[in-house]
């Protein structure tokens, strides 16, 4: 029988990535924060779906492992590379407790494509578009004046982002002052509090997140990826 986790594995993941490359997890935390506050203002999703979407936002770039690709991802370029999305898709699909959302991770930078090699439902595509909106808001505000965000979002309204989602963001911003809290770093305390209050995972879910973390770290080196794969198979055989 599963028992609640003894450690907060989400916090472990955040701390681990912060030591490796703080740029990615800081970006993920801000994207997760934007989504978290927006989801407080809707009844479109169940509490479990809201938490799942927060986790997707937090870890949406978990497949990034090359410094050059991280640099590209964190620049404001709408011609995004899919390489990190493919690795993220494989990690979520094969190891994480959110495997049903793997296609969301795969298409979070390409949610307006005309053809999808991996089928994606409208429900998941809407989530991917929402994550991409939060992603672009964060990247834009890191590199530009917040005052210019409105013009940017209007420029892509209807072409990349749903007008209703943009309106949803601005209503949430007016109520919760998301951008100001991100700039002052106050958001970190809210994210940390949310993680500790909502990440009450069962033992099997914790194990899956730890496997996701392990393999994501080892994607950074072909040698370590092969080593970990061999070690996992050997451990399973011994067990």
Residue ranges and their predicted role:
Residues 2-239:
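Histidine- and acidic-residue-rich, metal-dependent catalytic cores
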